[in-house]
Design a protein with these regions (language model features):
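Well-ordered secondary-structure scaffolds
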Residues: 1-96
């Protein structure tokens, strides 16, 4: 018996994310309609969740109480650990 590997998805258009600053640990999904779970980003990161257009995706594992960096500065703090490839939405953050 072999372990199942997660299914990956290739959207009709190549996945496009925007990382505003080199220190950022999240990127913004720019594809019209967002990206489905399983999408492989150019970096090789696989999305764990469907991420709507204009929303953030974790580029690395984000530890509980750690900062979410956008534009190189904290925009919020993680309430519980968020794995890389996950949708980072406001319900998961303490806002400054």
């Amino acid at each position: 018996m072999t372990a199942a590997t997660p299914a990956t998805t290739t959207p009709a258009r190549p996945p496009h994310t925007i990382r505003m600053h080199v220190r950022d640990n999240v990127a913004i999904v720019a594809n019209d309609g967002g990206l489905p779970a399983g999408t492989v980003l150019p970096s090789g990161l696989v999305l764990r969740d469907k991420v709507p257009q204009g929303h953030k995706v974790a580029l690395v594992d984000l530890p509980a109480d750690g900062p979410v960096l956008r534009y190189g500065i904290p925009i919020g703090y993680v309430m519980q650990a968020i794995p890389a490839g996950s949708w980072v939405h406001e319900r998961l953050l303490h806002m400054p």
